[in-house]
Amino acid sequence: MPTRDPREPFGRVTVAEAKQLLDEGKAVMVDVREPNEYAEVHAKGVRLVPVNHVITEVPQIRDFAGGKEVLFICRSGQRSALAAEYAVAAGLGDLPLYNVEGGTLAWVEAGFPTGD
């Protein structure tokens, strides 16, 4: 079940919760790593928006989300938390936003689908 810290403007989900939300069609996932990291391995179906582009890409993220929840993922969960904060600051706070804890490392370790 997603958790929320009242000090943060976003929630947190495990990779298992993220996969369930994606499988149920309730969420989309945005990978905020750099293109070279993304090219090595990424969760299936994610959209690449490097963390330093999140603020300028909010309209594209909103379009990609289509009203669904937005899950931010990075390598381990640090940059994706920052990306969620940036997204809120840039006006995306009206959508449910989540940081995927453990990031791509945990996604791969869990054996969840990767690639395009």
Descriptions of predicted regions:
Residues 1-27, 35-69, 78-116:
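Rhodanese-like catalytic fold shared by cysteine-dependent sulfurtransferases
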Residues 30:
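Conserved beta/loop motifs at nucleotide-recognition and modification sites
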Residues 73:
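Short, surface-exposed ligand- or partner-binding patches at beta-edge/loop junctions that are enriched
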